């Protein structure tokens, strides 16, 4: 933790536990996949891949808990997961295309905070 535990709300502590667990599950997925790639025994490789898939299941259960218990996670998951097309264009689509009247440019009246355009207009 980066702040004294006694200063954190119960909600923040619960989120911390979930986020820490999610990180650990994803790290375990990586380890099992690497071990499976490096393994020369077919039966052991299948066991390692089975274990990896279980860790993915645990990670997704934790991600779902985060979605259900935190509005910020819920909003981002709704925006980015299970979408089609280029991932980097999803935000533009979700915020009205990032034009001057939407939420993605300078002086726009959108409901999101922006820092304006990164490139000068020509």
Where are these regions (language model features)?
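Iron-associated oxidoreductase/ferritin-like identity signal
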Residues: 1-122
């Amino acid at each position: 933790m980066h702040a004294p535990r006694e200063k954190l709300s119960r909600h923040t502590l619960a989120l911390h536990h979930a986020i820490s667990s999610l990180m650990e599950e994803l790290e375990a997925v990586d380890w099992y996949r690497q071990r499976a790639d490096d393994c020369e025994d077919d039966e052991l490789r299948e066991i390692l891949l089975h274990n990896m898939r279980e860790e993915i299941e645990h990670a997704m259960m934790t991600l779902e808990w985060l979605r259900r218990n935190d509005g910020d996670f819920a909003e981002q998951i709704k925006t980015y997961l299970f979408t089609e097309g280029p991932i980097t264009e999803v935000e533009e689509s979700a915020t009205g295309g990032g034009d001057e009247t939407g939420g993605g440019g300078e002086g726009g009246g959108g409901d999101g905070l922006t820092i304006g355009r990164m490139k000068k207009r020509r």
